[in-house]
């Protein structure tokens, strides 16, 4: 099962450099902290609608080519992050199977827990980059993050109800 928001997320086209945008947009798109926390700061109750969690082959995560190690299996998690029940963000996390050793195995068992609640409590979290993307009227971003040096790719699409707009 997929969702129209995830189709739009996969259609994002990324800028080669950070574009000259309004400060308000850049404030959201370049946020280095947890988007879950940012939504909660808006006075909202944040919840996750889980669309898909499964191991997939390389052909289902082509956007990760060149950004993550080439492996036969990846853990894929697709969600909608909702504020007071309204979808504000679509998220897609691609995790190489080799990342899922040690404490990082918990990434397979997040269920309806927001990814940010786990990632941003880890003292081993680093971010290699943030790229800004756009699909028609919607903005998004992707980041390669590392836990204990092990990579994962997080792509986020800001939906029309999001305060980014």
UniProtKB/Swiss-Prot annotation:
Example of a GO biological process term: ubiquinone biosynthetic process
Reactions catalysed: chorismate = 4-hydroxybenzoate + pyruvate
Keyword check for Transferase: no
A Pfam family that the UniProt record links to this protein: Chor_lyase
Domain of life per record: Bacteria
Record's subcellular location: Cytoplasm
EC number: 4.1.3.40
InterPro entries named among the record's database cross-references: Chorismate--pyruvate_lyase (IPR007440), Chorismate_lyase_/UTRA_dom_sf (IPR028978)
Pathway(s) served: Cofactor biosynthesis; ubiquinone biosynthesis
Alphabetical keyword list: Cytoplasm, Lyase, Pyruvate, Ubiquinone biosynthesis
GO molecular function, one term: chorismate lyase activity
Gene3D superfamilies linked: Chorismate lyase-like
GO CC, one annotated term: cytosol
HAMAP family, A to Z: UbiC
Similarity comment text for this entry: Belongs to the UbiC family.
General function of this protein: Removes the pyruvyl group from chorismate, with concomitant aromatization of the ring, to provide 4-hydroxybenzoate (4HB) for the ubiquinone pathway.
Quaternary structure and partners: Monomer.
This protein's name: Chorismate pyruvate-lyase
């Amino acid at each position: 099962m997929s969702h129209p928001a995830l189709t739009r997320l996969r259609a994002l086209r990324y800028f080669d450099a950070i574009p000259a945008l309004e400060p308000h947009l850049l404030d959201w798109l370049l946020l280095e902290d947890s988007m879950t926390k940012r939504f909660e700061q808006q006075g909202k109750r944040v919840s996750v609608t889980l669309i898909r969690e499964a191991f997939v082959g390389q052909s289902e995560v082509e956007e990760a080519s060149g950004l993550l190690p080439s492996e036969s299996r990846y853990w894929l998690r697709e969600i909608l992050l909702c504020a007071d029940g309204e979808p504000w963000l679509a998220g897609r996390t691609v995790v190489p199977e080799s990342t899922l050793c040690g404490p990082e195995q918990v990434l397979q068992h997040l269920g309806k827990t927001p990814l940010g609640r786990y990632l941003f409590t880890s003292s081993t979290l680093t971010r290699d980059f943030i790229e800004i993307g756009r699909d028609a009227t919607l903005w998004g971003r992707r980041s390669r993050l590392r836990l204990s040096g092990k990579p994962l790719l997080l792509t986020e699409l800001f939906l029309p109800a999001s305060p980014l707009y």
